[in-house]
Amino acid sequence: MVANAKKDELSLTPMLNAYPDSLGGTLSDIADLLESSCKDAFGAFYILPSVFNTDLDRGFSVVDYSLNELLATPQDLERIRALGIRLKLDFILNHASVLSPQFQDLLKNGEMSKYKDFFIDWNAFWAGCGEMMPGGYIQPTPEYLHKMFFRKPGLPILRVRMPDGTEKPYWNTFCLLYTSPSPRDPKTS
């Protein structure tokens, strides 16, 4: 019985890896499956990050770490745990959404944000390793870029308008669309 494996034997048991909505629609549906046709088949369940409140990329752009109530409830997690299945949750701390409270604080407070170091300043990261372009970002030299994998075409830069009106490039692998706040149009104020 996999679910009754000793703690030191757990690494030898099968682990289910799934998005909470990938097997039926919700984590509750997965719990139903684990209680019935897959009973005792898994010793652990690695739940991919769309279990949290996210806005892009199947959960890899976290707004906050509350459970996404459309997909999961604390009761769903408890049902799975009660089966003797260890839960592994992917917190992906390095994938904050532009809607996250931390990024919103950066937009509001700029360099004074207590979260400014949560985000990678593109130019600070590449300082001394490329050329400043007219667009205000450093273009890394080919010797660095050819060793890297980028998920999407182009450089993963998000230009962010700071409170003082300047724009700053940040490294952003997932969201390439962001609308900087702009001054109110006098016609709509």
Please report, for each region that a protein language model flagged, where it lies by residue.
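Acidic/aromatic-lined carbohydrate-recognition and catalytic surfaces
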Residues: 2-180, 184
